[in-house]
Amino acid sequence: MAQKIRIKLKSYDYNLIDKSAEKIVQAVKNTKAVVSGPIPLPSKKEVYTVLRSPHVYKESREQFQLSTYKRLIDIYSNSSKTIDALMKLELPSGVEVSIKA
């Protein structure tokens, strides 16, 4: 039976996370492993409301939004080449990677 590796990616920038997911998929496919994904997970949006004025005018407010994007990649492999390829892979600093075997 093949070993299952689950990789979760998180980022505030969707372009960065898509490029990182593509790098991972390409590196794993070069080792002849089976890849499922990248699967887009629901994005989380946080909205922050602040007063524009430091003293009065409570009706005047400004809203800021912070979106967190997530992707899921499942890898099915028997070889150690796949794990070595993942360890040597360099990803941008704006992407959080969590790996479960």
Curated annotation (Swiss-Prot):
SMART domains: Ribosomal_S10. Transmembrane segments: none annotated. GO terms for cellular component: ribonucleoprotein complex; ribosome. GO terms for molecular function: structural constituent of ribosome; tRNA binding. Coiled coil: none annotated. Involved in the binding of tRNA to the ribosomes. This is Small ribosomal subunit protein uS10. It comes from Amoebophilus asiaticus (strain 5a2). The lineage of its organism: Bacteria, Pseudomonadati, Bacteroidota, Cytophagia, Cytophagales.
